[in-house]
C-alpha cells in the first residue's frame, strides 16, 4: 500500500477506535444504571430502564459503515479481494462481543416450532468449512433459475440440457412471480425423482435503497432485526410446507442496493442478520443472493469486520463473463469456501431443450441445495 494511503487508513483506524471506546463506555454505563435500579424492566411502573432493543442504532453496523466510508474515501471502493487487518476488523469484533453481552437476541422458537438440526449445523455457521460436515447436500455443476417454476413435463424435457439444478422462487412478499401453479411438495419430489437438485429462493423485503423500481414497494421497515426474524420464520415454514427438510439451504434474494449509504446499509444488514440467524436456528442453511458489486460486497465488508450471523452461502450475480465460483473480486479468496458459492453469470436468456423453451438465468454452482423429504 502506498505511504500516503497507509497514513490515511491509520488515521481512519484511530478515529474509529476512539468511537469504539466511546460506544463501549456508553454501553457499560447503561448496563450499570439498569443493574442498580430495583425491579424488572417492563413488569411494573417505575421499573428499570429497558436494555437497548435490537432494532435501535447498532454500534456494530455503525462501525462497519464508517469503515466502508473511510475505505471509499481512500479510493479503496474497487478492491479485488481485501486482505486481513483492514479498517474495522478489530473494532467490529469488539463491538459485536460487547453487544452480545449487553442483550441476548438469540432466536427462541415459540410453541410448536422446532430447533431440529440447529446443533448439527454448528460446523456450518461460519463463512468457511465444508457444509457437508453438518449434513448439507452439495451440488457442483450448472443450474438455471426462472421466474415461474416449470412443469414437471418441461423438467423432464430439459434433462437433455447441461443443467442439473433449478432455482425456484418459493416464498417472500417481494417475488416478481408470486403465483406458482406447479410449485408444491409434489413438484419438489417429482424433480428429485428425475435427478434434479433444487435451489430454493426466498424474495422477502428489500433494502430501502434498492435500485430496481419494481422492488421499492416492499421496503424493510423501521424494525429491521425483528422483521428479518419474522421473515426468516416464514421462510422456514414455507420450506417445510414444500417438503424441504432441515439442512436444506434457503437463499434470501436481496436485489442490488446502494450499500454506501450508511443508514440504508445499517438497516439492510440488520434485516439480513435477523433472517440468517432465525433460519440457522431452525436447522436450515441461510444463503444470500445479490449483485456482486452491492449486496455481496456489503457482506464481505461485514465479514472482514467480524460481524456474526452472516449468511452461510454466497450467490453472486455478475453477468457477461465466464462462469466461475472462485474468481469473484468482491470476495476474499478464502471467504465462503469450500462449497459455499454460486455464480449467476448470465441472465434473461432464452434456451430450448427437448422441444421446451424457457427464459432463464444461468448459474455455476458449488453449494448446498434443498434436502427434499
Predicted regions and their residues:
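Aromatic-lined carbohydrate-recognition surfaces of secreted/lumenal glycan-active proteins
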Residues: 279-298
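Distinct, well-ordered alpha-helical segments
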Residues: 297-305
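Secretory targeting and sorting signals
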Residues: 1-35
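Functionally critical loop-and-helix segments that line ligand-binding/catalytic clefts
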Residues: 58, 81-104, 110, 117-146, ...
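Short acidic/polar active-site loop segments enriched in Thr and Asp
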Residues: 164-166, 285
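Acidic, His- and aromatic-enriched active-site or binding-groove loops in soluble protein domains
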Residues: 220-231, 269-280, 305-327
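Substrate-binding cleft of extracellular glycoside hydrolase catalytic domains
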Residues: 135-161, 168-260, 264-269
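C-terminal region of N-terminal signal peptides and the immediate post-cleavage residues
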Residues: 22-67, 84, 116, 123
Amino acid at each position: 500500500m502506498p505511504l500516503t494511503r497507509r497514513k490515511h487508513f491509520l488515521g481512519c483506524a484511530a478515529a474509529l477506535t476512539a468511537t469504539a471506546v466511546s460506544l463501549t463506555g456508553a454501553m457499560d454505563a447503561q448496563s450499570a444504571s439498569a443493574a442498580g435500579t430495583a425491579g424488572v424492566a417492563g413488569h411494573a411502573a417505575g421499573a428499570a430502564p429497558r436494555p437497548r432493543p435490537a432494532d435501535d442504532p447498532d454500534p456494530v453496523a455503525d462501525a462497519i459503515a464508517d469503515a466502508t466510508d473511510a475505505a471509499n474515501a481512500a479510493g479503496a471502493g474497487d478492491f479485488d479481494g481485501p486482505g486481513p487487518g483492514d479498517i474495522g476488523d478489530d473494532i467490529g469484533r469488539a463491538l459485536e462481543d460487547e453487544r452480545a453481552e449487553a442483550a441476548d437476541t438469540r432466536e427462541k422458537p415459540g410453541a410448536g416450532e422446532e430447533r431440529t438440526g440447529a446443533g448439527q449445523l454448528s460446523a456450518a455457521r461460519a463463512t468457511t468449512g465444508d457444509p457437508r460436515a453438518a449434513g448439507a447436500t452439495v451440488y457442483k455443476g450448472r443450474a438455471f433459475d426462472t421466474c415461474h417454476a416449470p412443469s414437471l413435463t418441461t423438467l423432464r424435457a430439459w434433462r437433455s440440457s447441461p443443467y442439473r439444478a433449478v432455482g425456484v422462487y418459493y416464498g417472500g412478499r417481494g417475488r416478481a412471480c408470486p403465483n406458482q401453479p406447479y410449485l408444491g411438495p409434489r413438484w419438489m419430489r417429482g424433480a428429485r425423482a428425475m435427478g434434479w437438485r433444487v435451489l430454493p429462493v426466498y424474495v422477502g423485503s428489500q433494502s430501502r435503497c434498492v435500485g430496481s423500481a419494481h422492488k421499492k414497494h416492499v421496503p424493510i421497515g423501521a424494525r429491521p432485526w425483528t422483521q428479518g426474524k419474522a421473515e426468516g420464520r416464514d421462510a422456514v415454514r414455507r420450506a417445510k410446507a414444500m417438503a424441504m427438510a432441515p439442512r436444506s439451504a434457503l437463499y434470501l434474494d436481496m436485489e442490488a442496493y446502494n450499500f454506501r449509504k450508511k443508514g440504508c446499509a445499517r438497516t439492510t444488514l440488520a434485516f439480513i442478520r435477523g433472517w440468517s440467524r432465525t433460519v440457522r436456528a431452525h436447522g436450515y442453511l441461510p444463503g444470500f443472493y445479490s449483485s456482486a458489486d452491492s449486496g455481496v460486497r456489503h457482506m464481505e465488508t461485514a465479514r472482514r469486520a467480524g460481524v456474526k450471523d452472516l449468511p452461510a452461502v454466497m450467490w453472486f450475480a455478475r453477468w457477461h463473463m465466464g462462469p466461475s465460483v472462485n474468481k469473484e473480486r468482491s470476495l476474499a479468496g478464502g471467504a465462503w469456501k469450500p462449497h459455499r458459492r454460486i455464480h449467476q453469470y448470465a441472465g434473461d436468456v432464452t434456451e430450448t431443450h427437448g422441444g421446451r423453451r424457457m427464459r432463464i438465468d444461468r448459474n455455476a454452482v458449488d453449494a448446498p441445495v434443498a434436502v427434499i423429504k
